[in-house]
């Protein structure tokens, strides 16, 4: 038996780091050591047994919440947007705001004022989140902190009996994945990954098509995070004057693997029913050498960069128990258009989002899918003509988009998908339903960096993919979104709207009273 010193995973925050807390030794980014063995050329990592008294959280529900009381941790770049989105969701109350810098938390009070919501309690400092998590009037802790502190904040919240929603990546290594699984199973609280790309329009409509057999059996999928960050490297937070690289470039220099896999993997994993009738069994990763990365370091430091661990382009291949293949790519270095790929290959059809959105079906399959072709000799050698594509999308528009789509475009958040994600989270909590993404999704989507590093550091060897459900991946048949009955949904929404109306009345009075005091 050998022990591998594992690697960590980082978070892309777009252009700047959302610093909530300082980097400390308490925010571990590496597993303490994963035990593994070779088995017929495949690396097999030990799977910890489920502790006595715990049970699976597949399909986990919690009692209905008429009002979802929220505490936000991390108010740098992404956090304030989440606070604002929640002011548009009926039946929510923003109870507390936390950031390492008190000024950032205080600034978010302006968002509440604009929405006529009452002031929230403010927490700050390195351990401010611990006090927030101890409150008894919070149901959900929404974590948009820096990537080092996703896990410690989530751990604290779960240990204090709170449901948690965590920005991506939600866990930095295998140990953190297992710890979050154990905490969710032990506390019976939700632990959701905030993967917004699962709620983009093309992905949702295509998922609906796949679930209804439009593409036949989906046998292969691709996803990616390809985003040239050259304009942004100098905007990442730097730890003092001596730090010439910023956290992100320094991280990429020192660590290998797909460090931001969830945008690409999440949507295709849902389309392939991962841990809902199928599971990933094998991973193999390969990367290019670093050319751009090394050059970036040398230009900023004036010194030779002897090693840049993260390849300019990383490719990870995954095989499932049912013989499907997933390809995930990562590239933040080379000049090329933004691309998440999102491609599904089926036995009877094909879907592709980047760089060109389109569907490929022959006339017989399009007709069988309920859309009559308007052109003769339609085949699958090219994408559907515009009219046929629009008809297909209209027929298979996802019910969630029908419900939230227009409002999402008004509220915004990465084009609206953030608002849809938050709305679904609240909807499921208010109606006592399973969330759209569970803690096993979190683990499966976040572990690619460490597993990929293990593969590449051992000659691009195959790595047996852990079964995070511990044998229950085939219990649930097919990925599904949960819905309340129309009667319950309407009744709960009326209660939510009534609560929010009263809350806004209260908030307006409080802000008016404060304004009078300031005039005096």
Swiss-Prot record:
Cofactor note: Binds 1 NAD(+) per subunit. The NAD(+) cannot dissociate.
Cofactor entry: NAD(+)
Summary of the function given for this chain in its UniProt record: Glycosidase.
UniProt entry keywords in alphabetical sequence: Glycosidase, Hydrolase, NAD, Signal
Signal sequence residues: 1-27
Enzyme class: hydrolase
Keyword Cytoplasm: no
Keyword NAD in annotation: yes
Single Gene Ontology MF annotation: nucleotide binding
Pfam families in UniProt: GFO_IDH_MocA, Glyco_hydro_109_C
Name this polypeptide is given: Glycosyl hydrolase family 109 protein 5
Family per record: Belongs to the Gfo/Idh/MocA family. Glycosyl hydrolase 109 subfamily.
Lineage of the species this protein comes from: Bacteria, Pseudomonadati, Bacteroidota, Bacteroidia, Bacteroidales
Residues holding NAD(+): 77-78, 99, 147-150, 167-168, 196, 260
């Amino acid at each position: 038996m050998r022990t591998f010193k594992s690697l960590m995973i980082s978070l892309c925050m777009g252009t700047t780091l959302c610093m909530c807390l300082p980097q400390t030794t308490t925010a571990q980014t590496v597993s303490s050591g994963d035990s593994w063995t070779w088995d017929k050329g495949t690396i097999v990592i030990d799977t910890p047994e489920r502790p006595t008294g715990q049970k699976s959280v597949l399909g986990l529900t919690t009692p209905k919440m008429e009002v979802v009381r929220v505490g936000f941790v991390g108010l740098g770049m992404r956090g304030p947007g989440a606070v604002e989105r929640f002011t548009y969701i009926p039946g929510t109350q923003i109870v507390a705001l936390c950031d390492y810098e008190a000024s950032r938390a205080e600034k978010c009070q302006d968002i509440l004022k604009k929405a006529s919501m009452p002031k929230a309690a403010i927490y700050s400092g390195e351990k401010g989140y611990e006090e927030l998590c101890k409150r008894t009037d919070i149901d959900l802790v929404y974590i948009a902190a820096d990537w080092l502190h996703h896990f410690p904040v989530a751990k604290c919240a779960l240990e204090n009996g709170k449901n948690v929603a965590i920005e991506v990546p939600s866990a930095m290594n295998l140990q953190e994945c297992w710890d979050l699984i154990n905490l969710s199973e032990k506390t019976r609280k939700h632990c959701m990954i905030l993967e917004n790309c699962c709620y983009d329009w093309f992905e949702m409509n295509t998922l609906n098509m796949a679930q209804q057999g439009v593409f036949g059996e989906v046998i292969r999928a691709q996803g990616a995070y390809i985003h040239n960050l050259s304009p942004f490297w100098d905007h990442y937070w730097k730890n003092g004057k001596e730090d010439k690289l910023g956290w992100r470039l320094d991280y990429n220099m020192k660590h290998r693997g797909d460090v931001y896999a969830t945008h690409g993997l999440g949507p295709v994993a849902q389309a392939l029913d991962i841990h809902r009738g199928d599971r990933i069994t094998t991973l193999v990763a390969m990367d290019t050498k670093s050319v751009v990365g090394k050059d970036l370091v040398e230009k900023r430091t004036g010194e030779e960069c002897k090693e840049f661990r993260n390849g300019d382009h990383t490719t990870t291949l995954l095989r499932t128990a049912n013989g499907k293949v997933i390809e995930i790519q990562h590239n933040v270095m080379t000049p090329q258009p933004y691309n998440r790929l999102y491609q599904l290959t089926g036995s009877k059809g094909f879907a592709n989002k980047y760089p060109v959105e389109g569907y490929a079906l022959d006339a017989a399959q399009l007709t069988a899918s309920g859309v009559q072709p308007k052109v003769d000799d339609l085949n699958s050698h090219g994408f559907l003509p515009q009219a046929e594509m629009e008809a297909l999308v209209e027929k298979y528009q996802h019910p969630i988009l029908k419900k939230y789509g227009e409002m999402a475009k008004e509220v915004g958040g990465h084009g609206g998908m953030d608002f849809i994600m938050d709305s679904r989270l609240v909807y499921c909590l208010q109606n006592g339903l399973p969330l759209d993404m569970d803690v096993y999704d979190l683990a499966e989507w976040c572990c690619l960096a460490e597993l990929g590093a293990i593969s590449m550091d051992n000659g691009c060897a195959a790595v047996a993919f852990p079964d995070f459900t511990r044998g229950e991946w085939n219990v649930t048949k097919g990925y599904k979104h949960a819905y309340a009955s129309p009667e319950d949904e309407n009744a709960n929404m009326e209660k939510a709207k009534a609560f929010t109306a009263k809350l806004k009345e209260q908030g307006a009075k409080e802000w008016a009273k404060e304004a009078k005091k300031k005039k005096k």
